[in-house]
Amino acid sequence: MPESQSPNSSTNAPVTGTTHVKRGMAEMLKGGVIMDVVTPEQARIAEDAGAVAVMALERVPADIRAQGGVSRMSDPDMIDGIMQAVSIPVMAKARIGHFVEAQILQSLGVDYVDESEVLTPADYANHVDKWAFTVPFVCGATNLGEALRRITEGAAMIRSKGEAGTGDVSNATTHMRGIRTEIRRLQSLPADELYVAAKELQAPYELVREIAETGKLPVVLFTAGGIATPADAAMMMQLGAEGVFVGSGIFKSGNPAERAAAIVKATTFHDDPEVLAKVSRGLGEAMVGINVDQIPQSDRLAERGR
């Protein structure tokens, strides 16, 4: 796998980050909540609530879903404004396969690029070559094979997709359970059957063997999509997530500041029902949302970029 390269003015060689550094940045976010924000004010609310990072974007997934149209990378001025407003890491989204959007985001100095299915894909056949960048990438996955393909492309962090902008956590649970189940299956296979498993997963044998031996992905695994309550966040942590992305669920709710703080606390104390009961009180109305089963398969964001 590519290692660090120094800038070279005579050859114009690309500057890339080491695997250790990129994955290490995600390790520092483990156990935390990353929140979607569309304004500097929202970013400050997220930081005050205890978010470990924010995701800067012009429209939260619920609005993207409701308004339709083509969704693209956010305006650099908007991203700059959020970066200046907070001291925690700032992430931003690029379209699947849009390597120039990723180049722009890297030049802005964001801490992470999310090659995101929430935006309209720029390339339905190819993802960004993430090894070519200094900035680390996070990518979504609905199953283990998808996760391994993104890691092979250079992703330094994976999030189970769920179905963004719905407030319905059912797909998040399905995807997380599925990934964990597939990992346990690899652990149970004899060594000689891992070759067939690698073919089925469309992933390199060496990576499949590593997961069979360690029982986990080589990168941090967060969860996303439909998380709207403290209980949702705690459930996903108990299912094996190492952290939580929350999008529309906070700033589409009745009391964003309190809900944000409650979800952070629920993520930290996910195995303590008494704390969960306490932080779930008096939060006001959660986002109304939409049931995933009411969305046609062809319109589901999680189906993009598989």
From Swiss-Prot:
Keyword vocabulary terms for this entry: Lyase, Pyridoxal phosphate, Schiff base
EC top class, as a word: lyase
Gene3D superfamilies from the UniProt entry: Aldolase class I (3.20.20.70)
Catalytic residues in the record: K93
Binding site for D-ribose 5-phosphate: D36, G165, G226, G247, S248
This protein's pathway: Cofactor biosynthesis; pyridoxal 5'-phosphate biosynthesis
Binding annotation for D-glyceraldehyde 3-phosphate: R177
Catalytic activity: aldehydo-D-ribose 5-phosphate + D-glyceraldehyde 3-phosphate + L-glutamine = pyridoxal 5'-phosphate + L-glutamate + phosphate + 3 H2O + H(+)
HAMAP family: PdxS (MF_01824)
Subunit description: In the presence of PdxT, forms a dodecamer of heterodimers.
Name this protein carries in UniProt: Pyridoxal 5'-phosphate synthase subunit PdxS
